[in-house]
Amino acid sequence: MKKYLISLLLLFCTLIGTAQEHKSFDTSDWKRIKDLYASRPDSIRNLVKTLTSRAPKSPLTTEESLLAYIGQSYISQGKEEKILQEMFKALIKGNSDKAIASARQVLAINPISLPAIVFMGREACNMVGDSINTPINFDAEAYYRRIAKCILDAISSTGDGSISHPFVVTSEDDTRFFMHYQLRLKGIKRPEKTGHRLDFNLPCNSDRYNRAAISFDITRVIELQKQLKQQ
């Protein structure tokens, strides 16, 4: 067990070293995470389990949260995407019950789906008293907010939003949630896709981001989309 933990820590060091130098993942880093999933998927599952624990003994570091965020995409393989879109459609139609049911289905597949986590956090106050799904003395809103913050901080650590150092995401939907909740950017328009990158021109800045544009690395998103088309 100690040997596996040491190997995992060495991977963290490699990942964060790359993030500090380049502020982005490169091809070799994606391969390392993919190889870790292939050889030790439980190591990623344990990180996700800790991240989503109601009372974690020791909170994950940003580096660990990042590995959980990216690693989970290799476990769930984007299988939650169709249900996630059903959640969005239900929200547009004002059907909260359907949206909540869809969000729970999404989280059953991907426990750290950022859109589902954020939505459940917002709806937590409306679910107070639900004895089946809300245990006594459990602050659901704080629980979902904590997980969302860990994921958002993890994405923040991958770059600065420039073309040279784009933020890394594993879902296109995560880009807008990141811009809205982490960077407080508003009025976001449709992005331009350039290779493995999504570029947004920003109509205005915020106190957390002052560039005229913001870029995201969607390498993993493209991989997942190709896999889903082949199924």
At which residue positions do the language-model features occur?
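N-terminal alpha-helical interaction modules that lie
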Residues: 20-100, 163-231
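Canonical positions in the second alpha-helix
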Residues: 105-106
